[in-house]
């Protein structure tokens, strides 16, 4: 899932249905309502991933198309993106905790485009490991603006200082 930030706002099925009906009627939902809806969907999907044995992945903290003029001339995905600074460690932990409460937390990989989030992600990983699956919750590899020698070394150094580097999923190339 690629999100600007990871939301977490609890909602009942009735609340989510009301939000859906509101939007389908052409009304605009509030930020709080959007976060409730997104959270409900992410929890539902997480449970399905667990059932199917599929890893859930979160990519966050990227703002896309920030140069409006160039974005309108060249279109999306043409190089006008930037690192975001949304702080959402508490929301990520709450989302994983909600899935863990029902023993339906899937294998999960968490990527933030902001290297300042690495230590926070490292501590989140430790909150949800278990003895059934080594490295059940993983810190994704350094990516995009961090996919270079210094970025990878710094990310793996922080990961090794807070967790077990031997369970790291490894690096990737674009």
Named regions from a protein language model:
Residues 144-146:
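Conserved blade-ending motifs and adjacent loop-strand segments that build the rim/top face
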Residues 140-142:
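Active-site-proximal segments of catalytic enzyme domains
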Residues 1-107, 116-134, 151-170:
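Histidine/acidic residue-rich metal-binding segments in metalloenzymes
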Residues 136-138:
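Glycine-rich, often proline-containing surface loops adjacent to acidic residues and nearby aromatics
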